[in-house]
């Protein structure tokens, strides 16, 4: 089973990312088209202060409903996770063997990273460090809606180190992401492995960008 993990972080809902990955055409062409049989989506855990409304969950569900994704892929619920009731698995009756695993947030995100062949992440420092520590191929998607550009600067530094690839939302909408995933899955190792002290080095880069 070939798996890809999309993680949008826990605080601010990365709406543009969610909008792209809930597109039927995107899933069929970029995900299923690359032979991926398991698509894991961590869509966010943003809670509105005062009302306690789950902003991320509501936005994700609205995207799925508006695009009639469940009907298009003929998705049916397989089960909730035995360990986490927030995790739901869907199986496609249209594309046999394909399944989606979705959840807002997990305290054990490392297990989802570990089982993934490719991680496509927002540019949050926590998600980046978690993925690099587990030495998984990483594609960072920057959010140009954020006023503070430190995430993009961090991603640029990591690209220079050869640790990851960087994409924009527009890149995801084109064939660039599909081609990048294909290269990672079919080709030799395309990312530099970090030396033993690298985690400290990367954390230093992140700290430097945060305090600038």
Curated annotation (Swiss-Prot):
Subcellular location: Endoplasmic reticulum
Protein's name in the database: UDP-N-acetylglucosamine transferase subunit ALG13
InterPro entries hit by this protein: Alg13-like, Glyco_trans_28_C
Enzyme type, top EC level: transferase
This protein's UniProt keywords: Endoplasmic reticulum, Glycosyltransferase, Transferase
UniProt-recorded Gene Ontology molecular function terms: N-acetylglucosaminyldiphosphodolichol N-acetylglucosaminyltransferase activity
Superkingdom of the organism of origin: Eukaryota
Gene3D superfamilies assigned to the protein according to its UniProt record, in alphabetical order: Glycogen Phosphorylase B (3.40.50.2000)
Role description: Involved in protein N-glycosylation. Essential for the second step of the dolichol-linked oligosaccharide pathway.
E.C. designation(s): 2.4.1.141
Catalytic reaction equation(s): an N-acetyl-alpha-D-glucosaminyl-diphospho-di-trans,poly-cis-dolichol + UDP-N-acetyl-alpha-D-glucosamine = an N,N'-diacetylchitobiosyl-diphospho-di-trans,poly-cis-dolichol + UDP + H(+)
GO biological process terms, semicolon-separated: dolichol-linked oligosaccharide biosynthetic process
GO cellular component: endoplasmic reticulum
Organism annotation: Debaryomyces hansenii (strain ATCC 36239 / CBS 767 / BCRC 21394 / JCM 1990 / NBRC 0083 / IGC 2968)
């Amino acid at each position: 089973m070939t798996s890809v993990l999309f993680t949008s972080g826990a605080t601010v809902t990365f709406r543009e990312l969610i909008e792209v990955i809930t597109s039927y055409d995107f899933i069929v062409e970029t995900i299923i088209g690359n032979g991926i049989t398991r698509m894991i989506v961590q869509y966010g855990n943003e809670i509105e202060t005062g009302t306690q409304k789950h902003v991320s969950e509501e936005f994700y569900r609205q995207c799925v409903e508006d695009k009639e994704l469940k009907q298009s892929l003929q998705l049916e619920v397989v089960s909730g996770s035995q360990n986490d009731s927030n995790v739901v698995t869907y199986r496609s009756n249209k594309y046999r063997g394909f399944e989606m695993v979705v959840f807002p947030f997990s305290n054990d995100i490392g297990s989802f990273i570990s089982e993934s062949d490719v991680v496509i992440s927002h540019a949050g420092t926590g998600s980046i460090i978690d993925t690099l520590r587990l030495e998984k191929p990483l594609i960072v998607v920057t959010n140009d809606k954020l006023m503070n550009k430190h995430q993009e600067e961090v991603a640029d530094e990591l690209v220079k180190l050869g640790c990851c690839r960087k994409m924009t939302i527009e890149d995801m909408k084109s064939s660039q992401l599909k081609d990048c995933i294909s290269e990672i899955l079919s080709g030799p190792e395309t990312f530099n492995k970090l030396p033993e002290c690298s985690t400290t080095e990367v954390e230093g880069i992140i700290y430097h960008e945060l305090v600038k």
